[in-house]
């Protein structure tokens, strides 16, 4: 790369002229030094700048050189600028251009270069100030939106989803609370397909918030305030008492039978639960929970209060295929035959809030104020002697019984579900009322008399079975050990609807005398 050539003329800029003088003066002295050394000569340089400052260079001693100069008579060669220019033209140089000097003087910067570098630095600083702020810092928190379960408000979950919570919270990725699991919360849902939460006691499920939703028998979609996985067969307590055997972690011991004989402290509640029979809760139950005798004792201790909170289950599968006794515990775990919510919604009995008719039952009407609870049966309905009593007078006040659509046989198109689901017992059906037999290893406290549901569904009634859970009457426990495999009276028979009351009485007698 060649040297940069400049025009040999006076530099008008004072700064540039000073820089050029310094550089070229040093270059001249450098050349003089080289010449003096290489050629063994004496050189003296005397330079005055434009402000008459003296700059001199002497290879040995200036005085000696000057003395020789004064003593020398005639110079051998004397040149001026004109002679130099003429000599350059003869050698082929233009004389107007001169290359920049090399060596140490080229290391120095001119004022023009300094200004150029300074302007470039200022421009770069401006660019960094303008665009540097948009670059994110190394430590930043990216905001994200995550779903969390609300601990206080009741939620309505979809039948097809596991846990739907509408609340969203925006937090940072560095928030340690996002790494902690959410606490279980009570959910109010219509279908419980095996969610991970369950309540600590039945009192939280049977609070006063349900009183406004019961009694009028709304549609089964939005009526049950239950735990996320619990089913009617796993809730053996009616009036806010703790779950005795199902969830013993936070539950007090079960109250005695004498305490249960008092007047109920809550209004009658009707809870329609469309459970799909989740299998996941079976892993949480021990053998003691699945013991039929324990389940019977639980049902007997709660027999007097079972009328206050009946449970109407519309999706519990059948137990007939397994040959199990009618126990309240395993009713929600047979998923061989299920009635999904889509089929229930297509039925006229469950498609409207008025689908569940209560008939002439006075205890399941609109809820009365809390200070007027429905008392249990009067003292005249105390347990009779151990001998079986085949029938009761038909003028007796109709009892309340839970109704369930659990005993559905595969292939049965539900021909007996009419326009309403009546939960009253037929006045012409034989009724069995006897105390608990001690030989069955049940609780020695005898339950008050109650009735079983109708032997088979009628046009005005739904399919009835004792699989409605542990919120039923105590006679569930009486017949629980007596049923055995002969449960044909609960299957929807293919006989015509005009079957007389004598046939029903005969079938119920077969049931009670077994």
UniProtKB/Swiss-Prot annotation:
First-listed, main subcellular location of the protein, grouped into a coarse class: nucleus
A GO MF term: protein homodimerization activity
Signal sequence bounds? none
Would I find Nucleus among this entry's keywords? yes
Keywords (A to Z) from UniProt? Acetylation, Activator, Apoptosis, Developmental protein, Differentiation, DNA-binding, Isopeptide bond, Neurogenesis, Nucleus, Phosphoprotein, Transcription, Transcription regulation, Ubl conjugation
- DNA-binding segment(s): 58-86
Q: What is the effect of changing residue 20 to A?
A: No change in DNA-binding activity
Q: GO biological process: any one?
A: skeletal muscle cell differentiation
Please tell me, according to the UniProt entry, what happens when changing residue 121 to A: Abolishes phosphorylation by PKA. No change in protein levels. Loss of protein stability on PKA stimulation. Loss of PKA-mediated repression. No change in interaction with HDAC4 in response to PKA
| Post-translational modification as stated in the protein's UniProt record | Phosphorylated on Ser-437 is which is required for Lys-432 sumoylation and inhibits transcriptional activity. Phosphorylation on this residue by CDK5 is dependent on p35 and calpains. Phosphorylated by PKA at Ser-121 and Ser-190 represses transcriptional activity in embryonic and postnatal skeletal muscle, and stabilizes protein levels. No in vitro phosphorylation by PKA on Thr-20. Phosphorylated and activated by CaMK4.
Stretch list, region Disordered: 174-207, 244-269, 364-399, 430-514
Pro residues composition bias: residue spans: 367-396
Phosphoserine is carried by which residues? Answer: 98, 106, 110, 121, 180, 190, 231, 251, 437
One Gene Ontology cellular component term attached to this UniProt record is: cytoplasm
InterPro entries xref list: HJURP_C, MEF2-like_N, TF_MADSbox, TF_MADSbox_sf
Source domain of life: Eukaryota
Give a brief account of the tissues where this protein occurs.
Widely expressed though mainly restricted to skeletal and cardiac muscle, brain, neurons and lymphocytes. Differentially expressed depending on if isoforms contain the beta domain or not, with the total expression of the beta domain-lacking isoforms vastly exceeding that of the beta domain-containing isoforms. Isoforms containing the beta domain are expressed primarily in skeletal and cardiac muscle and in brain. Also present in lung and testis. Splicing to include the beta domain is induced in differentiating myocytes.
User: Which SUPFAM superfamilies does this UniProt record tie to the protein?
Assistant: SRF-like
Is Transcription set as a keyword in this record?
A: yes
| Phenotypic consequence of residue 190 to A | Abolishes phosphorylation by PKA. No change in protein levels. Loss of protein stability on PKA stimulation mediated repression. No change in interaction with HDAC4 in response to PKA
Could you say which residues are annotated as the site Cleavage? 288-289
Q: Which residues carry this modification: N6-acetyllysine?
A: 245, 432
The family note in this entry says:
Belongs to the MEF2 family.
Q: What does this protein do?
A: Transcriptional activator which binds specifically to the MEF2 element, 5'-YTA[AT](4)TAR-3', found in numerous muscle-specific, growth factor- and stress-induced genes. Mediates cellular functions not only in skeletal and cardiac muscle development, but also in neuronal differentiation and survival. Plays diverse roles in the control of cell growth, survival and apoptosis via p38 MAPK signaling in muscle-specific and/or growth factor-related transcription. Plays a critical role in the regulation of neuronal apoptosis.
Q: What quaternary arrangement does the UniProt entry report?
A: Forms a complex with class II HDACs in undifferentiating cells. On myogenic differentiation, HDACs are released into the cytoplasm allowing MEF2s to interact with other proteins for activation. Interacts with HDAC4 (in undifferentiating cells); the interaction translocates MEF2D to nuclear dots. Forms a heterodimer with MEF2A. Interacts with MAPK7; the interaction phosphorylates but does not activate MEF2D. Interacts with MYOG. Interacts with CCAR2 and HDAC3.
Protein name, per record = Myocyte-specific enhancer factor 2D
- The source organism is Mus musculus
